[in-house]
UniProtKB/Swiss-Prot annotation:
Required for maturation of 30S ribosomal subunits. This is Ribosome maturation factor RimP. One of its GO terms (cellular component) is cytosol. Belongs to the RimP family. GO terms for biological process: ribosomal small subunit assembly; translation. Pfam families: DUF150_C, RimP_N. The keyword Signal does not apply. It is found in: Cytoplasm. It comes from Staphylococcus epidermidis (strain ATCC 35984 / DSM 28319 / BCRC 17069 / CCUG 31568 / BM 3577 / RP62A). Keywords: Cytoplasm, Ribosome biogenesis.
Amino acid sequence: MSKITEQVEALIQPVLNDLNFELVDIEYVKEGKDHFLRISIDKEGGVDLNDCTIASEKISEVMDENDPIPEMYYLDVASPGAERPIKKEKDFYNAINQPIFVSLYAPIEGDKEWLGVLKSVNDESINMEVKEKAKTKEIEIPRNKIAKARHAVMI
């Protein structure tokens, strides 16, 4: 997490708590000449457009008061969607028995990307049930090899 996203998280977490929203992700990026602060929120039962609008207004107030970002930026508050990122420890535990997609720094069994059902999580690794051709098998992936993980929609 960058210094800016850490500062933003510290500022907006109390606001989101008051609104009963969970902070899923913060991303501060430059695209072309524009900067974007993207904040993903969620709550029990999911968020709708009205929830995102309310959160955006409250976050804007706090950001304007404290001004942690020196350049102009666009604020985007949205739902994390069906393929929400899995970043925090609790995200992995909440994803047990759900389909996930994992991208790795280095290949395991010849592949750097795995799609399957998360079966278990511990401090060192995750276990996924994956399909390989017509067979189902379980693989263990060390946590330190995971570059990115997200929920997945399997059809």
